[in-house]
């Protein structure tokens, strides 16, 4: 039996679901943002300006997709909470340019932010928990999230607080079913474009197909740098009790079951890895993999929940 979150058929599409433009506090227009990412090999983006919903149907091409979205926020009991919402052009309940009620939401519990987005057909993704100094227990308590950002490139570039792997492992160890996302959160104030992204395996580059693949975990998250690509993960599966990773040339591949059950592989001097396997213990409940290259760029699979 084979288990995997990655679809068995389809092709890979690269994109990012968290970008700001001149519509809020970014420095590039939506048109210039689309042109930048498309010229650098991306297949899709979501423009998620603060507290305003963007659809941008007029910027869609046959080979480039604009995902509707927004980022809404609140200050609750002294904590700052940001939640990204993304959806399909027809299925979100928000028109292009819709502005959220800041009076109602500015001090809302973060659960209200999630509920606002999901009630209108959006996926909700908790943004940059490390930058927000979010209480991990509060994050774990939220219901209706699709995932959280394991890497936020802008936060990493400006504050060195963009890698939230501790939060993700905290949630995973407690049985959370959230997926992990890479995101740019680009504003243009620093070199904060094209460093956090996701690569989705989907049947085609259409809104429903792409977002459906994301919902079922058919993607991996990456931390790269502008002009460079993180390790590519071609497949991650469990076959007859063995976890198998296949990837582009890498320095390290970690297969992690739990804090006390893991299996790393490290390339010897002058060599590289493109595959790693680990026979899982019979009581393993889930497994994920992390792949890093010789420049320190990283990709994270989604966890496979074992049956």
Describe the residue ranges of each PLM region:
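Ligand-binding clefts/hinges and TM-proximal coupling segments of bilobed small-molecule sensing domains
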Residues: 112-113, 120, 129, 228-232, ...
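Short, hydrophobic/aliphatic alpha-helical segments
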Residues: 164-177
